[in-house]
Amino acid sequence: MVEEGGVVVNQGGDQEVVDLPPGFRFHPTDEEIITHYLKEKVFNIRFTAAAIGQADLNKNEPWDLPKIAKMGEKEFYFFCQRDRKYPTGMRTNRATVSGYWKATGKDKEIFRGKGCLVGMKKTLVFYTGRAPKGEKTNWVMHEYRLDGKYSYHNLPKTARDEWVVCRVFHKNAPSTTITTTKQLSRIDSLDNIDHLLDFSSLPPLIDPGFLGQPGPSFSGARQQHDLKPVLHHPTTAPVDNTYLPTQALNFPYHSVHNSGSDFGYGAGSGNNNKGMIKLEHSLVSVSQETGLSSDVNTTATPEISSYPMMMNPAMMDGSKSACDGLDDLIFWEDLYTS
């Protein structure tokens, strides 16, 4: 018994199957199959290998070959002799009881070293039934034969038995995710993706606690709480423009000019009467519970709602924030009392 290429081979009679250590796999290259196995078998018919069995592919179906293989998980190797379809012909018989092997593609040349041709590899696919109406399967076979330097014509007559090495394996079916990827790539509108989104799992866009409340809406209760000291102390408390309502207040006296501003000031307006928003004392009052209210104020104490108000037009031209200085808010108590 001799060890060649890491595989235990038996050049005598009976073959002793040797298990490979964990982590080792029998995965020879095309050139190794030709040089270390097929050539040895052709020159010595008694040659056997621990990882390569011997089988007649015309008498065995491809799904039965793994059972008689010496070694292999996904690929199974066998020494085989070609069966001539006709005694005087050169065509190979590739039929079995259930179907036949059909060659596909072009034979591949196998070289050793720098351009030394030593063999050829043929690819075949198994079909069930009979040609030409056979049904293709996923069973594939690579058939290795000697050629070039090791051509049968260069061998003695005693070595001209047409031995080949066959590697048989089952090719996995195509993945079904390709269809899904193509379908997703064709989605180009919102109408096509509505069925892919689960809207029930999305959070609400509007806080239900603010639905149904009158007056302008703010981003949260914290902003309402921070707004109260600003209204009571307009000249000292810092103000962020995020506290301003995004929609116009429903003022009883609201003049609209060419600028389209919610406060009714034109870009070049010099008329204070046109640029004034008169706030009646019943318009807006500050409430400790709700922040803003439209309740009628019957008290005599002057509040923000009890003063007419005018804003400087420079606040609305975009160069100055509407809240950069509340000093621009001019309270006209005399106009109210008149």
UniProtKB/Swiss-Prot annotation:
PROSITE patterns named in the record: NAC (PS51005)
Swiss-Prot/TrEMBL keywords: Activator, DNA-binding, Nucleus, Transcription, Transcription regulation
Covalent S-S links between cysteines: none
GO aspect biological process, one term: positive regulation of chlorophyll catabolic process
UniProt-annotated location(s): Nucleus
Superkingdom assignment: Eukaryota
DNA-binding region per UniProt: 118-177
Function: Transcriptional activator that acts as a positive regulator of leaf senescence. Activates NYC1, SGR1, SGR2 and PAO, which are genes involved in chlorophyll catabolic processes. Activates senescence-associated genes, such as RNS1, SAG12 and SAG13.
Quaternary data: Interacts with RCD1.
PANTHER family listed in its UniProt record: NAC DOMAIN-CONTAINING PROTEIN 46, PROTEIN CUP-SHAPED COTYLEDON 2-RELATED
Domain notes: The NAC domain includes a DNA binding domain and a dimerization domain.
Name of the featured protein: NAC domain-containing protein 46
Lineage: Eukaryota, Viridiplantae, Streptophyta, Embryophyta, Tracheophyta
The encoding gene: NAC046
